[in-house]
Amino acid sequence: KQVFRHGKIINANLQSSGGNERVTYLVGGGWYQEEGIMYGSEFKRANLITNINMKPRKNLSLDARLYLSYSDRSRGSGSSGFGDGKAIERLTADPKQTSSLLPADGEVKDRLLQLLNSKVDKAYSYNIRSSLNLGYEFIRGLKFTTSISANYTEARANTFSPSYLDQQNNLSKSIGQMEGNMILQNEELLSYKFNVKEQHNFDLLFGFSYIRTSKNSMYGSGAGSPSDKIHYVLSGFNTTYTKAGEIVA
């Protein structure tokens, strides 16, 4: 009971679709929540998808798609590894270090559990994907299509260590990170299909594609929060630096 628990999974999805000869649509949403057999292994995800297909004229078509998702991988303890899981999640006992000879209750056990479970990890990620496609047929066989799509992903993480874990300075520490990635793509195509004497088929294709990617990341840390209830760096926090691989004030 100190190390494992009963796992639980909730997976709910709702979808609706319909339309007519000119317009069709599909809208769906989902929620996924998992509580693993190890303490602190919770995972949550929500997503929404929308597809719309339009054909206002016989030679004109329009497709639009949108996808949104949010995931939460927050944990009650652990290192500040950005987006990475740990071999030992939020346990009430550390099977790699805790001796089986220790008593069930007492100061030793309380201190061990305090060190193990007091750190707080927050990890969130967002994803937005959208695309728009337009097709127009000038004459039979001659068709022009243009499309534009974008994909943006952002992940954020924060690790907080309360003041009572710092035996030297009695200062809380907070480490925050953010990373964002974006991909933008545009494509223009002109195709022409024809045949000669219904025996020789030809398919000509002209076009170009443009792709642009961008990436940005931020990192910051601070110490000396006025309260262990405040887990994020605010104005007035002490500056920090790295010493022997540790964040110190």
What are these language model-derived features?
Residues 1, 36-41, 47, 51-129, ...:
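Surface-exposed loop/interface segments of Gram-negative outer-membrane beta-barrel transport/assembly proteins
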Residues 1-39, 77-80, 114-122, 135-137:
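Residues embedded in well-ordered regular secondary structure
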Residues 141:
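Active-site and adjacent substrate-binding regions of carbohydrate-active enzymes
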